[in-house]
Amino acid sequence: MELRIPRRLLVLSVAIWIAASGFLWASHPSARITVRFYSAGLELPALYGSELDLPSAITKGVILDVYEHLENCRFQPFVQALANHQQELQLSDWHLYEVAARASEVMFQDSRYQIIFQWFILRKLGLDTQLFFNGPEVFLHAPAEDVKFGFYTLDLYGEQYINLTAKRNNLNMEDTKAYIPELLRDGKKVRSISMEMKKLPLLPDGRIVERLLEFTHLGQTHRLKVRLNDDYLKMMDDYPYFNQAQFFHLGLSPEAEASLVPALEEMLAGRNQLEKVEFLLSFVRTAFLYKDDRRRFGHEKPMSPEQTLYHSYSDCEDRSSLFFYLTQKLLHIPAIVLDFEEHVGVALELEGVKGNSFNFEGRKYIYCEPTGPSDELAIGEMWDYVRQQNARILTSYLPGE
């Protein structure tokens, strides 16, 4: 059944709240707030004075009353500013939600009003969000198709709704039951939230951390220093798990790329293609210690190439992601990522090389093992336990695409 928002003046209950709280409209067009998003300060129009005193119990009527109240506030400049920040900084949907949530916390005192405001604003930005409540508390949910785990979920009307509030605030919802009203149909064209992050956000002036990496190749020790963006490291630590393949396309921050790629280019100078592949394999195999995600975190936690460079420990997925990135930047040859049952590896298109190979879209790819524990496997060789596993192509790279 469709639920329509009535187009009328504020209902009596809202009028009572206003009178009781001595509400005065005070949304000055010139009022601004600054929201911290890692090292960046994002300026937004303020909506001071638009908060209502909510009753102790949240009901469908209360939510709709607040919706209508916000409709009559000057919210459009706030929405436009958020949309501008998303476009200029390349923010994902999750980061857009984060900025909206932080802004609501700056402007409003009642955490429940903050959540209702987030719901209202995200819908105005074109994202399908819904509110579920259990009496005194209210939770922001959204349908999201690309979320695998890490969220409390509800299956409703053939869709899976993830609890954004619980994830952001690290709430334990195991024994919480929420009342689910009819979904809001306000005539706004909306889409499901995506956790996909195609590119790292463009954040200026991030704090830099340096990491000295030491590795061996053919018995010789090499050292190089990389400069990593602390914003990106923290951002990826905070970010919910999303599509596994996307981690292989995130790349490095400008600071990390500018320090790592030229240093490796210098080390690769004078080597032929196979020697370059062998050198890069030695780098990703021996510059880091190995530890499985389940032993480190208790669950799968893929890392971006920048995180792999920062942390002392990494696993097969992390090293494959870094090697996949380096082959694009330094070798410019076709590559595929292989997702085995219990392993991840990379294969490259290498002419005239024999060994274990995989065919994909008319090309032959030779297996290259990015993970240790030792640096002994030659190009085309595989560990026996890996060779016995089935594999799927997780993602691929072709120069020029």
What kind of region is each of these model predictions?
Residues L24-E401:
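A structural boundary/capping signal
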Residues V11-S21:
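Bacterial N-terminal signal peptides
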Residues E2-V11:
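Bacterial N-terminal signal peptides that target proteins for export
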